[in-house]
Regions:
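A short alpha-helical cap/connector motif
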Residues: 1-210
Length: 210
């Protein structure tokens, strides 16, 4: 069974299928993708398909980061091995993940504006092309904390952000990020996904001394 057949079998709802096609379209322009919040594995299948679309001389790379390694992660690893895509899983908090260069970041952890800003502001100097944010409709105006009526102080401590950040929705956080990072622009918003694109290449992170 091809990866596309797997996607077709998993998602028959038009909006869900379109979300995956957006990941595949922009992801196919990438050689390395990092995903924060990989549990469930659905977006991961689209990432693998995107990297397969762009497979060339060098192995593409997919790094999945999550607090839990469930069966879906193991399935992603098996699929990646089958199609010769380098797959790495990092168990832990996204805030502790070591930064490195990549073409794209897919962000789908606990949906709070403060969490998004903390993760993305740390990672963005290393991201060459795209940032995908999932959950921007259901938790766009208010955060997952507010929507689910969770203990804001406890969540803020767990996510290492302020209580205001835990209450902030994703859309105002994205607007705040774009205002202070003018080399990024929003290029797509559909359903639960928003895509940001870097408009200016990142500065050399490893400058050569004269």
């Amino acid at each position: 069974m091809s990866l596309q057949e797997v996607l077709d079998k998993i998602y028959t709802v038009p909006e869900a299928a379109e979300t995956l096609s957006i990941i595949r379209y922009y992801g196919s322009k990438c050689k390395s993708i990092v995903e924060f919040g990989s549990r469930g594995g659905i977006s991961g299948i689209a990432i693998l398909q995107a990297l397969l679309d762009n497979k060339g001389r060098w192995k593409p790379t997919f790094v999945a980061v999550d607090l839990v390694e469930d069966d879906s992660i193991k399935k992603l690893r098996d699929i990646a091995e089958k199609f010769e895509i380098a797959f790495h899983f990092c168990r832990g908090h996204s805030r502790q993940y070591p930064v490195h260069e990549c073409d794209a970041l897919i962000w789908d952890t606990f949906h709070t504006g403060g969490g998004f800003l903390a993760d993305v502001q740390r990672m963005e100097p290393w991201i060459h092309k795209y940032i995908f944010i999932l959950g921007t409709r259901i938790d766009g105006d208010i955060s997952e904390v507010t929507r689910r009526k969770l203990d804001c102080a406890a969540v803020a401590r767990e996510l290492q952000i302020s209580e205001d950040g835990a209450k902030q929705g994703l859309k105002p956080a994205i607007a705040e990020f774009l205002k202070t990072h003018t080399h990024w622009k929003q290029v797509r918003e559909y359903g639960e996904i928003t895509v940001l694109e870097r408009t200016v290449p990142p500065k050399s992170l490893f400058p050569i001394r004269a």
